[in-house]
């Protein structure tokens, strides 16, 4: 995994340069780094949250259809595509929200707790 923080405009320029050349070999997307800043993340094509979740669920004997995934960055989309339900956080980019089945509040507004509360009350996020 390679991550770099350069600033939003430069990040966009870097992604636009790299994606056409390397999209078949690596994943290139924005994510939130430990500092809370947006970083460009580059990973091997097979290294994604969806693949990691498949392995974890298989090991635990849990069906992916029973899993609800939460995310706010493009690196969560692979996970959204394989789980029974996918919830985007309110601060997520539009591409992430479009990939989710529903959108909850922002992480600063206890969005995960809001979704869990809805699940407990209605059976659906």
Kindly label every feature range from the protein language model.
Residues 43-125:
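Mg2+-dependent phosphoryl-transfer enzymes with acidic/Ser/Thr/Gly-rich catalytic loops
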């Amino acid at each position: 995994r390679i991550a770099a923080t350069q600033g939003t405009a430069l990040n966009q320029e870097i992604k636009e340069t790299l994606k056409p050349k390397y999209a078949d070999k690596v994943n290139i997307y924005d994510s939130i780094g430990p500092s809370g800043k947006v970083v460009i993340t580059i990973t091997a094509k097979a290294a994604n949250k969806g693949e990691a979740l498949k392995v974890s669920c298989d090991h635990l004997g849990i069906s992916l259809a029973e899993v609800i995934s939460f995310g706010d960055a493009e690196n969560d989309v692979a996970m959204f595509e394989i789980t029974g339900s996918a919830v985007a956080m309110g601060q997520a980019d539009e591409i992430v929200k479009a990939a989710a089945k529903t959108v909850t509040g922002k992480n600063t507004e206890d969005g995960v707790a809001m979704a869990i509360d809805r699940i407990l009350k209605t059976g659906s996020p």
